UniProtKB/Swiss-Prot annotation:
Keyword S-adenosyl-L-methionine among UniProt keywords: yes
UniProt keyword annotations, A-Z: Cytoplasm, Methyltransferase, S-adenosyl-L-methionine, Transferase
Native organism taxonomy: Bacteria, Pseudomonadati, Pseudomonadota, Betaproteobacteria, Burkholderiales
UniProt-listed Enzyme Commission number(s): 2.1.1.-
Keyword hit for S-adenosyl-L-methionine: yes
Family of this protein: Belongs to the methyltransferase superfamily. PrmA family.
Organism listed in the record: Burkholderia pseudomallei (strain K96243)
Protein name: Ribosomal protein L11 methyltransferase
Gene: prmA
Purpose: Methylates ribosomal protein L11.
Length: 300
């Protein structure tokens, strides 16, 4: 199937109405740009963060609609202009959109990722680069965690070095399930993944099935009672601080915990909250992010 871009320029007061009408009448997508971009008349649309912008569209707006090549653009634009209440149909130009194998193009942007000593995160359309690799088959999807983000990488490196055969592991904020799956592949016994997002829980279950990893997933209310040998939480600094008591209570005395989703400048603040329960410090830093790791004190 081939496509074309219908490009029309018009005053800002009509841009939103025309865009909405084009979508209602069958345009596949619509975007609005500054028609004066890269000229002396270019106008910034937004000001300082937190302030209400003075304008919600550019003085001279360019509306770009992606349409099926079988659609008559003149008829479509005339109908949209009438629907939007314009006095006349704007002038327009057509641009041919080069046909692409979009699946192949998307796949080409995701290559296998090497992490730690033996870990490879491999999309389903690739083969494992090394015969002795510890392979996690994972495709980009709706849930966070494909190994590309520094925090995920840090936690994976820590798990590879930490997990011992048969240990119990809790992945709190599991996202795609990548850390829970890795823990299982590293030899862990009972592994549990918890996430606040039901969609992430379903994605994690699917990924575990694909990787033949026996992991139990659920929402926070499903988190089992009791303690774990290892707890890992790759979330963000504020939730980590709020959940410090709960997460620390999930670690067995003498057990290990790793926390990430923490910027280097936030490390001391997060560590100080956990210091009541855990002997904790920065384990490793990567691209401005840190992984904090420690051991729960026997006396707590």
């Amino acid at each position: 199937m081939s496509y074309r871009e219908l490009v029309a320029e018009l005053p800002r007061e009509h841009a939103e109405a025309l865009s909405d009408a084009l979508v209602e009448l069958g345009a596949l997508s619509v975007s609005v740009e500054d028609a004066d971009a890269d000229t002396p008349d270019e106008q910034p649309l937004f000001g300082e963060p937190g302030l209400v912008p003075e304008r919600t569209a550019w003085q001279h707006s360019r509306v770009i609609a992606l349409v099926d090549a079988t659609q008559d653009p003149a008829v479509l634009l005339a109908a949209a202009a009438n629907e939007a209440g314009l006095a006349r149909t704007p002038r327009f130009e057509l641009r041919e959109v080069e046909e692409q194998d979009w699946v192949r193009l998307t796949q080409s942007q995701f290559e296998p990722i090497h992490i730690g000593e033996k870990i490879w995160v491999v999309p389903s359309w690739h083969d494992a680069p090394q015969p002795d690799a510890l392979v996690l088959e994972l495709d980009p999807g709706l849930a966070f965690g494909t190994g590309s983000h520094p925090t995920t990488r840090l936690c994976m490196e820590w798990l590879e070095q930490t997990v011992q055969p048969g240990q119990t592991v809790l992945d709190y904020g599991c996202g795609s399930g990548i850390l829970a799956i890795l823990a299982k592949k590293c030899g862990a016994g009972r592994v549990t993944g918890i996430d606040i997002d039901p969609q992430a829980v379903e994605a994690a279950r699917h990924n575990s099935e694909r990787n033949r990893a026996d992991v139990t997933y659920g929402l926070p209310d499903d988190c089992p009672d009791g303690e774990f040998d290892i707890v890992v939480a790759n979330i963000l600094s504020n939730p980590l601080k709020l959940m410090a008591s709960m997460l620390a209570s999930k670690v067995k005395p003498g057990g290990r915990i790793a926390l990430s989703g923490v910027l280097a400048r936030q490390a001391d603040e997060v560590a100080s909250v956990y210091a009541r329960y855990i002997d904790i410090a920065v384990w490793r830093e990567h691209e401005g992010w840190v992984c904090l790791a420690g051991t729960r004190r026997e006396s707590h």
